[in-house]
Amino acid sequence: MTDSSYDAQAVRSWLQGLQTQIADTLGAFDGTPFATDAWQRAPGEKLRGGGYTRILEGGNFFERAGIGFSDVAGDALPASASAARPQLAGRGFEAMGVSLVLHPHNPHCPTVHMNVRLLIATKAGEEPVFWFGGGMDLTPFYGYEEDAQHFHRTCRDALQPYGADLYPSFKRWCDEYFFLRHRNEPRGIGGIFFDDFSAPGFDQSFAMLRSVGDAFLKAYLPIIEKRRNIPYGQAERDFQAYRRGRYVEFNLVFDRGTLFGLQSGGRTESILMSMPPVVNWRYNWQPEPGTPEARLYSDFLVPREWV
């Protein structure tokens, strides 16, 4: 985080285009256009700035799909952003990014999350400090080996031009990050996750971020195209709702993006659009041995090298 030369407008323009491209593509896939909710922080609020929330609820394929763009600034980095770098505590900041979570109706189609972001810390009389973060991860309810392999292969290929070491490092980071410590289990089958990324300089770091964001549809669309017409019943929906409970637990207890948004006075509706619309908890529930539900735990919710 030593290179202070950056082009925030270039990042902003790309993020806005990425949000539009993904929303248009997924809206066409569903047959339902995304609604757009433009928002702006009022004068005197803790944060300045605004964004666009693209939301689809009760669609033909997606039960809930949210794609948010935000560009906000504040006077002091919240604890969730500065804990790992105490020297930046109290600095002003600008944070911009696109974050999405997609919840299909069909339990055979996985939930997916993707985020790409830029954060700039500022202090009067000192050079600004920037870094990129992001990634994508897949949360299946019924596991398919070829889907997990395709998702990870696409992530690896997006990172390959920027260093052969990035995918193994970001994959391991993702496995460690999306882990429910109180359950001793991962949230899903992972993907890639990175933060504090700026060492190659702005141009190369931004190019890597673009490669990740632009790979999202390649990673996810072939999976849902293949699984969308698999029949399912109430038992599968019940298991999906039960596993979605883990998603809620992670997002509200551990997720740095959620905590950053809430701690910084972010827009609650946009922050919590990642929540699944139907979810349940059961006391000490265990899957029947030999079932597809049991196989999710034994074969997919374990550390694996998918590619």
UniProtKB/Swiss-Prot annotation:
The protein in question is named Oxygen-dependent coproporphyrinogen-III oxidase
Specify the species: Paraburkholderia xenovorans (strain LB400)
Q: Name one Pfam family in it.
A: Coprogen_oxidas
Marked site: Important for dimerization: H182
Q: What class of enzyme is it?
A: oxidoreductase
Cite the EC number.
1.3.3.3
Residues at the catalytic site: H113 (proton donor)
Protein localization: Cytoplasm
Q: In which pathway does it act?
A: Porphyrin-containing compound metabolism; protoporphyrin-IX biosynthesis; protoporphyrinogen-IX from coproporphyrinogen-III (O2 route): step 1/1
| Signal peptide stretch | none
* InterPro entries registered for this protein in UniProt: Coprogen_oxidase_aer (IPR001260), Coprogen_oxidase_aer_sf (IPR036406), Coprogen_oxidase_CS (IPR018375)
Q: What is its main location?
A: cytoplasm
Cytoplasm: present as a keyword of the record?
Answer: yes
**What family is it from?**
Belongs to the aerobic coproporphyrinogen-III oxidase family.
Which keywords annotate this record? Cytoplasm, Heme biosynthesis, Metal-binding, Oxidoreductase, Porphyrin biosynthesis
Which cofactors is this protein said to need?
a divalent metal cation
Q: How does it assemble?
A: Homodimer.
